[in-house]
Amino acid sequence: MNHDFQALALESRGMGELLPTKKFWEPDDSTKDGQKGIFLGDDEWRETAWGTSHHSMSQPIMVQRRSGQSFHGNSEVNAILSPRSESGGLGVSMVEYVLSSSPADKLDSRFRKGTFGTRDAETDGPEKGDQKGKASPFEEDQNRDLKQDDEDSKINGRGLPNGMDADCKDFNRTPGSRQASPTEVVERLGPSTNPPEGLGPLPNPTANKPLVEEFSNPETQNLDAMDQVGLDSLQFDYPGNQVPMDSSGATVGLFDYNSQQQLFQRTSALTVQQLTAAQQQQYALAAAQQPHIAGVFSAGLAPAAFVPNPYIISAAPPGTDPYTAAGLAAAATLAGPAVVPPQYYGVPWGVYPANLFQQQAAAAASNTANQQAASQAQPGQQQVLRPGAGQRPITPSQGQQGQQAESLAAAANPTLAFGQSLAAGMPGYQVLAPTAYYDQTGALVVGPGARTGLGAPVRLMAPTPVLISSTAAQAAAAAAAAGGTANSLTGSTNGLFRPIGTQPPQQQQQQQQPSTNLQSNSFYGSSSLTNSSQSSSLFSHGPGQPGSASLGFGSGSSLGAAIGSALSGFGSSVGSSASSSATRRESLSTSSDLYKRSSSSLAPIGQPFYNSLGFSSSPSPIGMPLPSQTPGHSLTPPPSLSSHGSSSSLHLGGLTNGSGRYISAAPGAEAKYRSASSTSSLFSSSSQLFPPSRLRYNRSDIMPSGRSRLLEDFRNNRFPNLQLRDLIGHIVEFSQDQHGSRFIQQKLERATPAERQIVFNEILQAAYQLMTDVFGNYVIQKFFEFGSLDQKLALATRIRGHVLPLALQMYGCRVIQKALESISSDQQVISEMVKELDGHVLKCVKDQNGNHVVQKCIECVQPQSLQFIIDAFKGQVFVLSTHPYGCRVIQRILEHCTAEQTLPILEELHQHTEQLVQDQYGNYVIQHVLEHGRPEDKSKIVSEIRGKVLALSQHKFASNVVEKCVTHASRAERALLIDEVCCQNDGPHSALYTMMKDQYANYVVQKMIDMAEPAQRKIIMHKIRPHITTLRKYTYGKHILAKLEKYYLKNSPDLGPIGGPPNGML
């Protein structure tokens, strides 16, 4: 009831924000005989699971905590165990996080009271762990973990109050936690040979079968013992069920009251037939005394000989919980039931109340359903009566039996789907999902849909029959015929749903198509389903239109799914609900892991967890998958099928991949799903029976960060061995991510041609986008390096027509440069690319990005193709030479262009040599000419320098040119420059003395010492010697002294020859 107020506190929280984790419960010894269900009283809190420091809104405004009165009216269990607050009255969100789909332990209530300690030791003991092989190369040995879990369970007097084995921690809030792989879970939770004493389970002939294949559902190996005797555990699955093993099949409901089946745990005192008869009597009485849900009960009995229903009825005082052990024991005596107050439920527009309830028709449907189910149950106790939506049939005949029994549910009465959805409600509530209503305590309960604009399409209805369209009625009739039932159209539609117009069933559409059961029910499902499942679609055009989808609901969505969706956020858990017993589905509830990512049922993270397409999910009853869909009947809120609803909805639940399979936030946790089924819920058309060997992510699954789930998983190191082929459909996105781009670059270097082609096919369509991307441009460049010629030319063709904007763009200019480097200049595409710059040369040259493109063109393209660049420079050489980027282009021209092309450039340079040598950029051009130019060009520059050596040597930029003149001038020119320094006087001192003290000129002196011929060097030394004492006072004079000391140490005192100069010109 309080679920939605809890949701208010969680609405804005993204799934990425995993909180610091505390244990929910610390082990301690508790021998109290009080209720040990999941709803613990105030006195039974062991430790606050989350502190208020993390959740300032964990106690919503105006929600007062009621001590001693929980929402289901039991004063003994007076608080709800909430994961978000130490205030116990805040809803069921712990269930979504902790117990969500199927905790692995179904415990006898007597074991809960203190004798449970030996169970894990017997089933998951060290010897069990030692026998288990590693399920995955990425999984480390888990013996230590298993033993630790055993220790905890032994210490814990209550067993595990949340009904979940510690190993089942798929959605663990600790990011570093390990997780069990699907196969590992099967092996670890595998066949149990040591049942606890007192439970007396029936033999399970399939429990000890080895794991058949990697993808086989754990339920196939660990069948529910209740299934063996034809007793079906219900959605509310009040455990205590006689399953002595951790089994994903033995899924436990959210509200773990332990007592629903306590009625049957008289240690084999009653036979199966007696139990079944007793339960049918109970429900018949309940239906009689509560006629408005008689159809619900009758439909609920259809899938198996017995379907426990949460809406029974205890003779206990009205103030007590009708679902406690005492209440059920009283109900077993068939005393007067305690009627649960009816609630309002939300119904989509277009479904109208009938205000009439044909009890006789409902009773007939109930009888028929019971008889059919009983007859289905009789043929053999060794065959599982209801394999469940997540299991494969053990034998073909059994699969047919299961299909018929399952389809009987929708066939017997259209109230099945709605009734089973009702049955999924919380204790005390018989309806699914009102957007807002008052509960029996007078508190206003607002459904999560109210915050996401769901109020409009859903209205409150009294719990009366509703009218449905004639096509849906025909669908129900066709389902009845296909399911093998003898119900007439009238009998099958006179229950909770009444047709607007009745028509005879279409017999020609009654053939069964078991193979098409395996199709994934995508949200806009166009997959072909059986008539029994398809014809029960609420909004389908008719039973004979496999691919039709009207009003946005997949034609494969079952009647229960559609009605349940209107009331519970499309809570059908996707499978073909009425006839999916033989389908291979990994439903959310079929896994022993907490949030095992199902094949096609869960909402992607960051998308609405509760609702899809604007339909309300259940606030307190938590809209349930139908019993025929989910073998474990977990109380997990039905996730939206494809997250097409409002992205502002509640972000609850675990991390999922693109197909919606829940994963842990722990790094490396994704490894175990690499070979598991994960077909996408939205785009999948592949069979669930044969899941793909590699993960498939949904392109539309966008994380709150904007990244897809595959990329998010990769960034969080969940894919240690990701390959390029795993990125199909995500290449462009990965290329635009820092880590994804680096990954693709590394793989492309060693990729096979086929793998490169896979990548190339995707990036070619987004080539321009990637070329201008900060990370994507590197992937394009890598293709220019390692791609085939055809691939290079194809990418170059994408550049063509965009050369100028790319050249001026920070990242695009790099792509163009790489293309120019990697493609031969004689290719026509290169010439065409270069010609696009014609008319924009100066713009590019002066651009910080474009100048690199022009330089690369000059370097890589034939000079004859670059005449337009030379022409553009005419009259602009001085300006460009003094430009920070233009000076670079001038130097490239001088290096690579022909003499005819460089001649006009040099002439302009010589005209401005004096200015250029003193310019911060122009001096580089002059130096470049001195280093690489022709001798006549060097001589022209030296002649410009002569007579100005002293002045220019003291200039910051010109001093560099003077050094280059000393280095690269001819011997005669060098001697003239040195003599100018030695012989010239600067006031009282020589020019040499002035230069030695100068911060720039001292480098010219050092260069002269190095380059001078021996005779000239001796003269320089004698000129310097008188100033040695003075030079020691100056910072730059010390450089000269260091140079002198080097020569004095190397040479004789007379400063004779010291060998040739460094340039070898002597």
From Swiss-Prot:
Adenine-nucleotide binding in RNA target: annotated span: 741-745, 813-817, 887-891
Annotated GO biological process: adipose tissue development; chromosome organization; hair follicle development; miRNA processing; mitochondrion organization; positive regulation of miRNA-mediated gene silencing; positive regulation of RIG-I signaling pathway; positive regulation of sprouting of injured axon
This protein's record includes keyword Transferase: no
Keywords: Cytoplasm, Methylation, Phosphoprotein, Repeat, RNA-binding, Translation regulation
Record-annotated disulphide pairs: none
Ranges for region Non-specific-nucleotide binding in RNA target: 851-855
Modified residues (Phosphothreonine): 183, 395
Comp. bias intervals (Low complexity): 368-383, 503-514, 526-540, 630-650
Compositional bias of kind Basic and acidic residues: 119-133
Tissues in which the UniProt entry reports expression: Widely expressed. Expressed in embryonic stem cells, heart, kidney, lung, skin, intestine, spleen and thymus. Expressed at intermediate level in brain and liver. Weakly or not expressed in muscles and stomach. Expressed at various stages of myeloid and lymphoid cell development. In the testis expressed in the spermatogoni, spermatocytes, spermatids and Sertoli cells.
Pfam families reported in the protein's UniProt record: PUF
GO cellular component, one term: perinuclear region of cytoplasm
Stretches forming Pumilio repeats: 726-761, 762-797, 798-835, 836-871, 872-907, 908-943, 944-979, 980-1022
Region called Uracil-nucleotide binding in RNA target, residue ranges: 777-781, 923-927, 1002-1006
Chain segments carrying region Disordered: 106-203, 368-408, 490-551, 620-650
Domain PUM-HD residue range list: 706-1048
Ranges for region Interaction with SNAPIN: 1-260
Regions of compositional bias (Polar residues) in chain numbering: 394-406, 515-525
Modification sites for Phosphoserine: 67, 70, 82, 102, 136, 177, 181, 587, 592, 684, 700
Keyword field contains RNA-binding: yes
Modified residue annotations for Omega-N-methylarginine: 674
UniProt-annotated stretches for the region Guanine-nucleotide binding in RNA target: 959-963
PANTHER family found in the cross-reference section: PUMILIO HOMOLOG 2, RNA BINDING PROTEIN PUMILIO-RELATED
Subunit structure: Homodimer; homodimerizes in vitro. Interacts with DAZ1, DAZL and NANOS1 via its pumilio repeats. Interacts with NANOS3. Interacts with SNAPIN. Recruits the CCR4-POP2-NOT deadenylase leading to translational inhibition and mRNA degradation. Interacts with DDX20. In case of viral infection, interacts with DHX58.
Role, per record: Sequence-specific RNA-binding protein that acts as a post-transcriptional repressor by binding the 3'-UTR of mRNA targets. Binds to an RNA consensus sequence, the Pumilio Response Element (PRE), 5'-UGUANAUA-3', that is related to the Nanos Response Element (NRE). Mediates post-transcriptional repression of transcripts via different mechanisms: acts via direct recruitment of the CCR4-POP2-NOT deadenylase leading to translational inhibition and mRNA degradation. Also mediates deadenylation-independent repression by promoting accessibility of miRNAs.
Protein's name according to its UniProt entry: Pumilio homolog 2
Source organism of this protein record: Mus musculus (Mouse)
Gene: Pum2
